A protein has these predicted regions:
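Helix-breaking motifs and short loop linkers at transmembrane-helix boundaries and internal kinks
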Residues: 37, 69, 90-96, 124, ...
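Conserved MFS/SLC helix-loop-helix module at the cytosolic interface between two early adjacent transmembrane helices
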Residues: 56-95
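Helix-to-loop junctions at the C-terminal end of transmembrane segments
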Residues: 58-69, 264-276, 360-361
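Paired small-residue
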Residues: 80, 84, 95-103, 302-310
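Cytoplasmic helix-loop-helix junction between adjacent transmembrane helices
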Residues: 100-141
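Juxtamembrane intracellular "pre-TM" segments in multi-pass secondary transporters
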Residues: 182-217
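C-terminal transmembrane helical hairpin of 12-TM major facilitator-type secondary transporters
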Residues: 278-322
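A late C-terminal transmembrane helix in Major Facilitator Superfamily
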Residues: 328-363
Length: 399
């Protein structure tokens, strides 16, 4: 059987593709609008469709992962991503592109959240935030690659090439996972006596919602999605329209966002020891807040680039803290709890995208960024005050 470290590297490859798929349209919205004779706000539906499907499907992947094994679900979700990415590359109209992007989101939903839940099963709480930070490195690299390549392809190769490349990445990841994780997947298939029906799962989910800690984590995750991740989808368009970057240039600048998060993932242990979870949440919210306000009102390209870097650093200080809280809010139903966390996060993001798309077409994106920045400053303080830095007594990996 492969070690958990080896398995983590392999699922990191699938997670890379998942985040690349999520962010690949950010830098091509203007190009899509031109090709399909739509506004940039209308073209942003290719992002919101992915996000909505991604969030809703968590309600299925949670119980599915608990029933047949998280790694098995990750493998088949990755195969499905390869198929739907190929279909997306052939979409002839904006409406069909939106539908195929929704299918991509529905498939990709089975990768990262279940990977987080798998880490929660395998890694003791004391090492969990550091381990999640390493998984974060794979997702951030995927996000960076997706945002850059989406803009580059739209400008130089044609946007369809971007989805062909994604299909190839997902296929390779699925084949490698299928070949190397057979033993782990078999080991995680629960006995028939332990399986629960879907109605029982949904009853259990409602029971989770009765827990104050679960409700708090889900509330702040929805706010994070609406205030932070929704704004992230429109930063490349802001860079093009207000700072004079080309689509590929905007994608390249967005690499700095991922680089900021990647820096955090590499030094997470030291920062956690220095600031604690409360300090990380407070500083992260403040950093992202300041960067959004700068992107809203600054005019110098170098300030935009610096803001992207520090926004990435700040967001993942806050988000990694919330991820860790999600793995611990209901340890007895961790797979379902973490996918519920992801569902609410992306539902919040989809709501934020709808508001920001309308503000973009009305020319008021700067005001929306400023309001979101203020909200993130408040959110970081709220999380800092209420986060639970628990140290469980004898929590062991779940075999």
């Amino acid at each position: 059987m492969n070690s958990p470290k080896t398995t983590l590297r392999l699922i990191g490859l699938a997670a890379f593709g998942s985040l690349a798929a999520m962010r690949i349209c950010d830098s091509m919205l203007i190009a899509l609008g031109r090709e399909f004779h739509a506004t940039t706000g209308d073209a942003s539906r290719v992002i919101s469709a992915f996000v909505v499907a991604y969030g809703v499907m968590q309600l299925l992947y949670g119980p599915l992962g608990d029933r047949i094994g998280k790694l098995r679900v990750i493998v088949w979700a990755t195969f499905a991503c390869a198929l739907f990415s190929a279909l997306t590359s052939m979409a002839p109209t904006l409406e069909l592109l939106i539908v195929s992007r929704a299918a991509m989101g529905a498939a990709a939903a089975g990768i990262v959240p279940l990977s987080i839940a798998w880490v929660g099963d395998q890694v003791p709480y004391q090492q969990r935030q550091e381990t999640l930070a390493r998984l974060l490195g794979a997702t951030l690299t995927g996000m960076m690659a997706g945002q850059w390549f989406g803009g580059f392809a739209a400008q130089s190769l044609g946007w369809r090439v971007a989805f062909m490349a994604l299909a190839a990445i997902f296929l390779i990841a699925a084949l490698v996972l299928h070949r190397n994780t057979v033993a782990e997947r078999r080991a995680q298939i629960p006995a028939a006596a332990n399986l629960v029906s879907l109605p029982t799962y949904f009853r259990n989910s409602f029971q989770l919602l009765k827990m104050p800690r679960v409700r708090w984590v889900l509330t702040v995750s929805a706010l994070e999605g609406a205030l932070a991740y929704a704004c992230l989808a429109f930063v490349p368009s802001r860079l093009v329209e207000n700072f004079g970057f080309s689509p590929s240039g905007a994608g390249a600048v967005m690499i700095l966002f991922g680089a900021g998060g990647l820096l955090y993932s590499q030094i997470a242990r030291r920062w956690l020891a220095l600031l604690g979870e409360r300090g990380l949440a407070l500083l992260g919210g403040a950093l992202f807040s300041g960067c959004l306000v700068t992107l809203a009102w600054a005019r110098q390209p170098w300030l935009a680039a610096a803001s992207c870097f520090f926004a990435g650093l700040g967001l993942y200080m806050l988000h990694n803290t919330l991820q860790t809280q999600a793995t611990q809010m209901a340890p007895e139903s961790r797979g379902s709890a973490v996918t519920l966390f992801a569902c609410i996060l992306f539902m919040g993001q989809s709501c934020g995208i709808l508001v920001l798309a309308a503000s973009l077409d009305r020319g008021s994106l700067a005001f929306s960024f400023s309001i979101a920045g203020l909200g993130l400053l408040i959110l970081g303080g709220w999380v800092s005050r209420h986060v639970q830095a628990r140290q469980p007594n004898q929590e062991r990996p779940v075999k």
